[in-house]
UniProtKB/Swiss-Prot annotation:
Matching Pfam families: PAPS_reduct
Annotated GO biological process: hydrogen sulfide biosynthetic process; sulfate assimilation, phosphoadenylyl sulfate reduction by phosphoadenylyl-sulfate reductase (thioredoxin)
Lineage: Bacteria, Pseudomonadati, Pseudomonadota, Gammaproteobacteria, Enterobacterales
Protein name according to UniProt: Phosphoadenosine 5'-phosphosulfate reductase
Enzyme Commission (EC) number: 1.8.4.8
HAMAP family xrefs: CysH (MF_00063)
Length: 244
């Protein structure tokens, strides 16, 4: 697998582009997470960045990638509505792992948004999507542009939801290469990695949370609920960051 140029890839016919990505993904599927990170850092364009929601398993990807690129910018899109435990977890991991944390927020404050639009998360799917566009998608797009990102690492896993079940290791999203090093990991592998390296789950894991986002759209997992139903009142699984 040689160096990849996004411009050259985008210049290909759609069928050729799809075939090229499929060929490299076939090889990446057989590699370990560490090997995927190493390959991406060697062959994909700079600037490499890593996004994190600092959720339940966040420490895995943060350690995995920063072990090979200690100063990689770590992008957090802060909505202003994260749990207090999340903010403390961010501080803890930033200090423990020496993260180069880059925080991006909406251009309008949470209070001003509520004054202007009301509580968007209580306005059905349309309101949730508008909220996510303002507080997650636009700040992420701005982060990628500001940092000059060419390669984007993220910690998604196929096991997490139906919407992620068929994601490839490598794709093109928002005009950059996107690599998912632990896409094929299961919960057991996450646990083993955290234990082996003395890292912790998000503090709310012990209280029954399987997925953690904003305080107003995250629920503790109850008997009979799927992980997908604990976010956005079960109306959506994705916040928009990893779509499109």
């Amino acid at each position: 697998m040689s160096d990849w140029d996004l411009g050259e890839l985008n210049a290909l016919e759609k069928a050729q582009q799809t075939a090229a990505l499929a060929a490299v993904n076939q090889q990446l599927e057989s590699q370990t997470a560490e090997q995927r990170v190493a390959w991406a850092l060697e062959h994909l364009p700079e600037q490499a960045v890593l996004s994190s929601s600092f959720g339940i398993q966040a420490a895995v990807s943060l350690r995995l990638v920063t072990r090979q690129r200690p100063d990689i910018p770590v992008i957090l899109t802060d909505t202003g509505y994260l749990f207090p435990e999340t903010y403390r977890f961010i501080d803890e991991l930033t200090e423990t792992l020496g993260l180069n944390l880059q925080i991006f927020r909406a251009t309008t404050s949470p209070a001003w948004q509520e004054a202007r639009y009301g509580k968007l998360w209580e306005q059905g799917v349309e309101g949730i999507e508008r909220y996510n566009q303002l507080n997650k998608v636009e700040p992420m797009n701005r982060a990628l542009a500001t940092l000059g990102a060419g390669t984007w690492f993220a910690g998604l896993r196929r096991e997490q939801s139906g919407s992620r079940a068929h994601l490839p290791v490598l794709a093109i999203q928002r005009g950059v290469f996107k690599l998912l090093p632990i896409i094929d990991w299961d919960n057991r592998q996450v646990y083993q990695y955290l234990t082996r390296h003395g890292l912790s789950y998000h503090p709310l894991w012990e209280q029954g949370y399987l997925s953690v986002g904003d305080t107003h759209t995250t629920r503790k997992c109850e008997p009979g609920m799927s992980e997908e139903e604990t976010r956005f009142f079960g109306l959506k699984r994705e916040c928009g960051l990893h779509e499109g």
